[in-house]
Amino acid sequence: GLWSKIKTAGKSVAKAAAKAAVKAVTNAV
């Protein structure tokens, strides 16, 4: 249903944000 779609989207967004954060930290160091 709609809620599971929202949950899935939230998970992928969180994953992308985590990847971006790791990249930013790596570039800073």
From Swiss-Prot:
Tissue specificity note: Expressed by the skin glands.
Protein role: Potent antimicrobial peptide with activity against bacteria and protozoa. Also has activity against fungi. Probably acts by disturbing membrane functions with its amphipathic structure.
Keyword entries, A-Z: Amphibian defense peptide, Antibiotic, Antimicrobial, Fungicide, Secreted
GO biological process: defense response to bacterium; defense response to fungus; killing of cells of another organism
Protein name according to UniProt: Dermaseptin-S5
Keyword Secreted: yes
Family label: Belongs to the frog skin active peptide (FSAP) family. Dermaseptin subfamily.
GO CC terms, sorted: extracellular region
Localisation: Secreted
Major localization listed first in the record, in broad terms: secreted
Membrane as UniProt keyword: no
